[in-house]
Swiss-Prot record:
Protein name according to UniProt: Tyrosine recombinase XerD-like
Active site: residue positions: 148, 209, 241
Compartment(s): Cytoplasm
Molecular functions (GO terms): DNA binding; tyrosine-based site-specific recombinase activity
Family per similarity comment: Belongs to the 'phage' integrase family. XerD-like subfamily.
Biological process annotations from GO: DNA transposition
Length: 242
């Protein structure tokens, strides 16, 4: 399994110090857990609780990225993800605009990256994203047709997001396997892996959707306009942003 560490690190563009840190943390992880399963992972996470929170977060972030790599490369049969503890500062960031420009950087989880961008840029729900067909995307006009509860709405796409979609739009659905859309569980795994890779494991589909709303409010858009773009029938769920 240790050879997988070298393969994993070779895929990432890291400084010398970062490579050494990843190698140390992951070798220590493998030595401690032995066989990777739910029990060994819980014991590993418990062993970190005496460390500073910043050290815990660094180690757990590296391990989560490595676990996704192992699953993706079929070293392990199941996908595992360790919970990264939140500190008070992180919790207080709820309701505040975050700098998530790192999402536009290249990723080892391209599908998770695109899911994150569709939520952040257009406030789409994972279920809406999974139902997107390639035919719903009109690249020339930079628009996307989204269906929710039998109702369709048109979503305007940014130039950057249009370019991203043009690279991955093939087949019947935007995200598919053998002509059928992936499950929501798959989408959440992809999103979690991407967020972990970018050091944003504390975020979720819901918090990314909130970031979309906050960005729209910053641009002086009304709650009624935002509700319409999100496919909501009223502004009831947006009242807290008044």
């Amino acid at each position: 399994m240790k050879e997988a560490i070298d393969q994993f690190i070779q895929q990432k563009q890291l400084s010398k110090n970062s490579r050494l840190a990843y190698t140390y943390d992951l070798e220590q992880f493998l030595e401690q857990v032995g066989t990777i399963n739910d029990t060994s992972l819980r014991l590993y996470q418990s062993s970190l609780q005496s460390l500073k929170l910043s050290v815990q977060k660094r180690k757990l972030s590296a391990v989560n990225q490595f676990l996704y790599f192992l699953y993706n490369q079929k070293y392990i049969e199941h996908y595992y993800k360790l919970n990264i503890p939140k500190d008070q500062k992180e919790n207080s960031s709820q309701g505040s605009l975050l700098d998530l420009s790192v999402f536009w950087q290249e990723s080892q989880v391209p599908q998770g990256r695109l899911i994150a961008l569709l939520i952040l840029e257009n406030g789409l729900l994972p279920s809406e994203i999974l139902s997107i067909k390639v035919a719903d995307i009109q690249l020339d006009f930079q628009i996307l047709s989204v269906e929710k509860a039998g109702q369709k709405r048109i979503v305007q796409l940014s130039s950057k997001l249009t370019e991203e979609l043009s690279r991955m739009a093939s087949g019947t659905y935007l995200f598919e396997k053998k002509g059928k859309p992936y499950s929501r569980q798959w989408a959440f795994r992809q999103l979690e892996a991407f967020l972990s890779e970018k050091g944003q494991a504390g975020l979720s589909a819901q918090s990314l959707r909130e970031q979309y709303i906050l960005r729209q409010l910053k641009d002086k858009r009304s709650l009624h306009d935002i509700a319409r773009d999100l496919g909501l029938k009223s502004i009831t769920t947006l009242e807290k942003y008044r």
